[in-house]
Amino acid sequence: MTLFEKILAARGLTTRAACEEFLNPNYASVKHDPFLLPDMKKAVDRLKKAHAEGEKIVIYGDYDIDGLSATAILLDAFGKFGFKEVGAFIPNRFVEGYGMTMGAVDKVRNMGADLIVTVDTGSLCHAEIEYASSLGIDTVVTDHHNVAETPPPSVAAVNPKFPGHKYPFRDLCGAGVAFKLVQALQTELDGLPDGYEKWLLDLVALGTVCDIVTLADENRANVYWGLEVLKKQRRPGLKALMSVAGIEPEKVNARHLGFGLGPRMNAAGRLETAQYALDMLTASDGLEALEASEKLEELNIKRRSIQDEIFDEACQQADNMTDDRVLVVNSDNWNHGVIGIVASKLVEKYKKPVFIIGERGDEATGSARSFGDFSAADAVRAADDIIIKGGGHGAAAGVTLATERIDDFRRRVNEFYDSLQLKNQELYLLPRADVEIDDFSEINEELIDNLAKMEPFGNGNAEPILKITEATVLNVRRMGADGQHVKLTLRDKNDVALQMLAFNAPEEFFREVGDEVSAWFQPTVNEWQGMRSVEGRLLHLA
């Protein structure tokens, strides 16, 4: 069995048929009937009425990439279906905040809306939808987030998370649900012939990867074929953004979406308004697309600078909290749109759950990141009597509280951690190898080419990790302006050497020549000045 076959087997792909199905995703075979989703028939019927009567439709999106992608999908498709009046509203993180709000509904009314179609939001917005109804505005909800026991008072609520339906795949993202609405409308309206909806898959892929939903079933096929659409550069905005980000279209993969396009789009909503990102997605000519993309690049550079500044300040606080099991850091000058990213970086550095809180006068808003058996959402609930509001899930949560209660909150979440009597939580942060190897004999370009066939990588289909059980450090080289990166050369038992690279490496990666180590890594190809060499992306050393 080759190393590649061992990796596939480690993923449960042990038969030829299973491997074939996985490595060659079939769009048609997982194009599930959209009418199996709850309320899809009601949604289509209401949209047919709007189409026939020329009503004004406002697509109400979310400011994250999934919401923006879903908004762009419906703007594109509704235009082809011939809807006469269609607009979009993206809430501002710093003005309206997350989800539907009463103030946002007023703004949508002022846009002349007869019908709101939500994307990536709405399932829990009962009061806001009721308010829109009192203004004579109907609402069709399309969403994928968790739901309440009772559905919202909308004309339709299309969400695979609702119980009691027969749709076979529940982990669609907001863009995926919007795409199902398009597929359903294709059966009732002219303008977008069957098969032509596939040109929307670049947007579906963007939302799916960046919202970190499971890359299985329909999601895997949508992203696989969405990347093929993206390579053809049919959308001026994404073509320009790839150029600005230095991404070669013919080589674009899921990693480029998550770490190249995604951060640039998110920077707009984190610092100013996500409308800039929507302008890029919907740009109709090259100049407009380039201007929008350059604006996103400018904001992303600014975002990185702000993020680095907050991270440094947070580290100064965290360094004085060595006895705390949960880090709670706070300041009155931290940008609320960036603190979530910083929380993730703090978890990576300190190997502890983190709450990072930005004060705004008497009130403070925080973002949490956690891992293992310590649920961020449960920690928030444990402080229910201290906070104003909060919620989330195991790995991430948000909280709003009075600024004067931050110290009380810090004590409470640490007491909650202690009450759980958790052991060895940092082990959850270590990489887990798909396969252990005892030499580098099969780490070559053929393996790299085969691993590329497993794309797209993401949640539920992580990039494969290998562990070399015994190797000797042959060379150590510090790199970067501050010596923060490391390039190690490791030698196996057969004297075969492989270079491994780690950016912003922890100090324990800087080993001595002659050290015996085990290394967890991902095989990659380094291309430099026309030369290709196989190396490893170093993840962990022991």
Question: Where are the regions a protein language model picked out?
Answer:
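Short beta-strand micro-motifs in enzyme catalytic cores
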Residues: 364, 397, 484-488, 532-534
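Accessory interdomain/linker segments of ATP-dependent helicases and helicase-like nucleic-acid enzymes
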Residues: 437-498
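OB-fold single-stranded nucleic acid-binding module
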Residues: 405-411, 513-542
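Beta-strand/loop nucleic-acid-binding surfaces
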Residues: 493-511
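Short alpha-helices
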Residues: 73, 150-191, 197-209
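Residue-level recognition of well-ordered beta-strand positions that form the cores
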Residues: 434, 489-491, 501, 520-522, ...
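Hydrophobic helix-and-loop "lid/oligomerization" segment in the mid-to-C-terminal part
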Residues: 2-115, 135, 187-411, 418-425, ...
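Histidine/acidic-residue-rich, glycine-tolerant segments that coordinate divalent metal ions
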Residues: 112, 119-172
